[in-house]
Amino acid sequence: MATDQGGGDMRGLVEQIARALVDEPEQVSVQAVDGEQVTVLELRVAPNDLGKVIGKQGRTARSIRTILSAAGMKLRKRFTLEILE
């Protein structure tokens, strides 16, 4: 049960970061897909906000993934971020 809560916390974290970056925060959604070893967080944003979430040369996306990785270490669980169109 603790891992589900951790996944939910990470989902909320990614959602909050993404909403701060985009022009249409109501279109942001994050879904957690639990696997055996990794929880995949699927981030969806409006098509015109996709570039803002990815950033120049993927820097913003890489930063979000780094935050996820660091927070996941505390929970002893791995998280990956997929940005979907």
Predicted feature locations:
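RNA-contacting regions in translation and RNA-metabolism proteins
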Residues: 1-50, 63-85
